Amino acid sequence: MADMRRRNGSGGSSNHERNEQILFPKPETLDFDLPCDTSFPQQIGDNAASSSGSNVKSLLIEMGFCPTLVQKAIDENGQDDFELLLEILTKSTETEPPGPSFHGLMEPKPEPDIEYETDRIRIALLTMKFPENLVDFALDRLGKDTPIDEMVDFIVAAQLAEKYAEESEDSLDGAEINEEDEDVTPVTARGPEVPNEQLFETMDKTLRLLEMGFSNDEISMAIEKIGTKGQISVLAESIVTGEFPAECHDDLEDIEKKVSAAAPAVNRTCLSKSWRFVGVGAQKEDGGGGSSSGTANIKPDPGIESFPFPATDNVGETSRGKRPKDEDENAYPEEYTGYDDRGKRLRPEDMGDSSSFMETPWMQDEWKDNTYEFPSVMQPRLSQSLGPKVARRPYFFYGQLGELSPSWWSKISGFLFGIHPEHVDTRLCSALRRTEGYLHNLPTVNRFNTLPNPRLTIQDAMPHMRSWWPQWDIRKHFNSGTCSNMKDATLLCERIGRRIAECKGKPTQQDQTLILRHCHTSNLIWIAPNILSPLEPEHLECIMGYPMNHTNIGGGRLAERLKLFDYCFQTDTLGYHLSVLKSMFPQGLTVLSLFSGIGGAEIALDRLGIHLKGVVSVESCGLSRNILKRWWQTSGQTGELVQIEEIKSLTAKRLETLMQRFGGFDFVICQNPSTPLDLSKEISNSEACEFDYTLFNEFARVTKRVRDMM
């Protein structure tokens, strides 16, 4: 201890007091005050380290040693041997040249105070088990005056950025990474140097999302699902909605270019902005030559249950000449049992003879070598080749509003020549978020959009609301389920309005997140500054692609008008897939429309500039029939409209009469589910999108009868 007394050459009384502290430390001298917000359970958890190391360092600093020297001594020798640290620090102090002498009371020491304050924050962050280099990096970037909660957010953002940067590097195929290369060394392996540009970009997005009130887990999941290149608005929207697009960072044009470049020249087509259930038409490699089967190898989508389409199991004869067992006959529930005009059970093979089935690509033996599954959301559609006996007039189009299980699509495909359905995200053509399924025998080339061009976001569909739409409301699309309960939605808007008024129009980040979730769930819109409102029928008419005031007809209540939009096509999306009919029927066409709803198919064809020579519409809902009839009379149609109320009345005899009257049908279209008879009955969104097998059976029966007659 004599060495310690000689350290500064001053009186021994102060040194003696320090020795007293060493021998008899008071409990309070071992601690230091921290702000109340320095405890973060998600960072500390079970990994909180003991504070003994911090106490040793704090004690040495209080003894007057330089914090930098104390930290250096601890780094080099550890913190277990206090006497050794004391001896090293004493010798280091003795070897330093004496500084300028200050006499009297003027003896300022600003630098040690600054270092001590910085070191106090540093110790607090290290106690939370953050990496030392990230703590130093945060202090270097933000400064000691930054609140510790912002320090924590910054370090968490850096950790997330580092995590996804490492994952991105690991995913590079065939890339050899040199650990000595500074550009690819993770942040935790460096010092407080500046990370690369990608890390800074990810950190900035993470900090912005943290400021919006989202948790670390939510942000981490969003970045993991979408990727570090996703925009902040897309990341925030995915957290709010709980939906994560597979490849949102790729533009649709880029995807189409990639697929066009990869597809064989013989099958290169104009790719649509929708996605086929499975692609067929590419040449299949068979030794050195190609096969004419037209079956493409499709990689299975991980995480989704696979199933083979039973196209060959559902036809009269398989490619091996054996008739399948009848055990599938009872696969449907009793209430779904369908019959044809003669009272006979409708079977898949009734749609045509086996020879027509055998000409389709799925009827080859190779179908057993491939598993057909739902593709990822952004998997481009590949062209499909159908035999001449399948792809002929009358063309048919079956549209399923909402999602459907693979097992049901398997059964539907078995009834319709084994054709695979086309799954469509309506966001690609509109401001509506809904998945629809189409099964048809139309060509898939030379499609084009309806006019005027579709509006793809809420802001485009409602440009007059942009001036008062808050920046933190990052929604771009509406949900498919409309809020038909106007009373509940209005009360919700009033409650949110009072909350916004309480904070004088500036809600906190937590309030913004909560309001955004309500807006997404109930499809609320901003009709004035800080004022929300439910969607009105006029708004939905614009979003769904219908004429203004299309559903504004006498006898239709507001709630009933809103519910109609749960049972209708989005005409921009439908029109894109029907656009091929314009060149096929330049003089116009006759349409058999089953379960027409409010006339989505008819309006889509009219928007494409296709002349409707005649339309036979089957619709059980009286309000929907009146809406379609008024549109036909006011839109300048020169053809003939025949409306039928009950599908059961469309017997073979009546079909024959109608076909003689119109000269046959060029196009048969059906939407499922149909509009309910009682629109006043409350139905959940899941029930509204349920599959009605009886309705599909009627479509299959009528389509078969029409094709047999032509």
Swiss-Prot record:
InterPro entries: SAM-dependent_MTases_sf, SAM_MeTfrase_DRM
First-listed, main subcellular location of the protein, grouped into a coarse class: nucleus
Gene Ontology, cellular component aspect: nucleus
Domain (SAM-dependent MTase DRM-type): residue spans on this chain: 379-710
A GO term, aspect molecular function: DNA binding
Gene Ontology BP annotations: methylation
Biased composition (Acidic residues): 167-184
Keyword match NADP: no
Keywords: DNA-binding, Methyltransferase, Nucleus, Repeat, S-adenosyl-L-methionine, Transferase
Locations listed in the record: Nucleus
Region (Disordered): 1-21, 167-192, 282-360
UniProt domain UBA: residue ranges: 52-92, 198-242
Biased composition annotated in UniProt, kind: Basic and acidic residues: 339-350
PROSITE patterns in the record: SAM_MT_DRM
Role, per record: Catalytically inactive DNA methyltransferase that acts as regulatory factor for DRM2-mediated DNA methylation. Required for maintenance of non-CpG DNA methylation. Required for normal establishment and maintenance of RNA-directed DNA methylation (RdDM) and accumulation of specific repeat-associated small interfering RNAs (siRNAs). Required for nucleolus organizer region (NOR) nuclear organization during interphase. Acts downstream of the production of siRNAs. May promote RNA polymerase V (Pol V) transcriptional elongation or assist in the stabilization of Pol V transcripts.
Family: Belongs to the class I-like SAM-binding methyltransferase superfamily. DRM-methyltransferase family.
Quaternary structure and partners: Interacts with Pol V.
Protein name in the entry: Probable inactive DNA (cytosine-5)-methyltransferase DRM3
Organism: Arabidopsis thaliana (Mouse-ear cress)
Gene that specifies this protein: DRM3
